[in-house]
């Protein structure tokens, strides 16, 4: 197998949270959230794919945003990955994960779904949004068998 070349790809500004560290919302001027069009996504995908072909690499994508699941063409993009046998990781938030979504992500080639935990409940919820801590723990446990995350101590932290 050819070595990987990784791309971190920001596909949308849309997000359910307003994290204090987030570059999208840090200046307070977020009235116009941006997302790539489907045409831009296809162009970007094929540019990355062609780059990897030229340099003998296997493309690997880290999808991020905002929350990539909120992009209107998110599932179309995953079909494109699947059609080209490209694996990926999602850097997202927990609010749109359920058993069915996790199974579909795995089927499309998702190897990991990164959820951030910024401390105990009070700190995490202050940093992200109220209720995020409990939702993150709940979804971390849901995603464990699908995405091979091993966090056995998480329930004890709540």
Residue ranges with predicted function:
Residues 112-118, 148:
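A short, terminal or domain-edge coil/loop segment
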Residues 28-32, 121-128:
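A short acidic, helix-capping loop that chelates divalent metal ions and anchors anionic groups
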Residues 131-134:
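Charged helix-capping and loop-helix junction motifs
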Residues 104-109, 138-144:
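Short secondary-structure transition/capping segments
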Residues 1-112:
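Conserved alpha-helical substructure of the radical SAM core
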Residues 65, 90-94, 117-119, 153-157:
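A cross-domain feature marking catalytic cores of carbohydrate-active enzymes
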Residues 139-158:
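Conserved strand-turn element in the central/C-terminal portion of the radical SAM core barrel
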């Amino acid at each position: 197998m050819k070595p990987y070349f990784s791309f971190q790809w920001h596909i949308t500004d849309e997000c359910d949270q307003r994290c204090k560290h987030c570059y999208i919302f840090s200046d307070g001027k977020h009235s116009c959230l941006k997302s790539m069009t489907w045409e831009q996504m296809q162009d970007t995908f094929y540019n990355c794919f062609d780059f990897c072909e030229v340099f003998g690499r296997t493309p690997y994508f880290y999808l991020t945003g905002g929350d990539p699941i909120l992009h209107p063409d998110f599932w179309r993009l995953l079909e494109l990955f699947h059609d080209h046998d490209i694996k990926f990781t999602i850097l997202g938030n927990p609010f749109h994960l359920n058993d069915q979504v996790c199974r579909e992500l795995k089927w499309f080639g998702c190897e990991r779904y990164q959820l951030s935990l910024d401390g105990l409940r009070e700190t995490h919820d202050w940093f992200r949004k109220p209720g995020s801590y409990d939702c993150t723990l709940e979804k971390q446990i849901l995603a464990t068998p699908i995405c091979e995350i091993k966090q056995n101590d998480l329930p004890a932290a709540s």
